[in-house]
Swiss-Prot record:
InterPro entries: UPF0145_dom_sf (IPR035439), UPF0145_YbjQ-like (IPR002765). Pfam families: YbjQ_1. Belongs to the UPF0145 family. This is UPF0145 protein BMA0904.
C-alpha cells in the first residue's frame, strides 16, 4: 500500500482515478506523559516558548497514528487514502488520544 504521495487531505488525487471506496481507515494512539517528562516540561514553561518535550511526544503520537491508519487501509485492500485528518482529545488528565483517519480507496493512474 500506500505510497506517501497517495495519502492526501484532499478528496481526489491528481493523475489518479478512484475506482473503489473501501471505507474509513483509522489509526488510534493513546499516550500519557511520564512524571519525568511532565517535570521537564514544567521547567520549560518557566522560560516560555516551545515546550520541546511535549512537541516531541505529540509528533511521535501523530506518526504512530498515521502508520496505523496506513496499515488498516492496506488490510482493507486500499492503495491510497483520501480526506486524511488528525484529531486529538484529552481523555483523562495527562492522557491524550490521537486519531488519524481517512477514506481508504483503490486508485489507478488516469489515462
Amino acid at each position: 500500500m500506500a505510497d506517501p504521495q497517495l495519502i492526501t487531505t484532499a478528496f481526489d488525487i491528481p493523475g489518479y482515478r478512484i475506482e473503489r471506496s473501501l471505507g474509513v481507515a483509522r489509526g488510534i494512539v493513546v499516550r500519557s506523559r511520564s512524571i519525568v517528562g511532565t517535570f521537564g516540561a514544567s521547567i520549560q514553561t518557566l522560560f516560555g516558548g516551545n515546550i520541546s518535550l511535549y512537541t516531541s511526544l505529540c509528533e511521535r503520537a501523530r506518526q504512530d497514528a498515521y502508520e496505523r491508519m496506513i496499515d488498516e487501509a492496506r488490510r482493507m485492500g486500499g492503495n491510497a487514502i483520501v480526506g486524511m485528518r488528525y484529531d486529538a482529545t484529552e481523555i483523562a488528565s495527562g492522557v491524550t488520544e490521537v486519531l488519524c483517519y481517512g477514506t481508504a480507496v483503490q486508485a489507478v493512474r488516469a489515462g
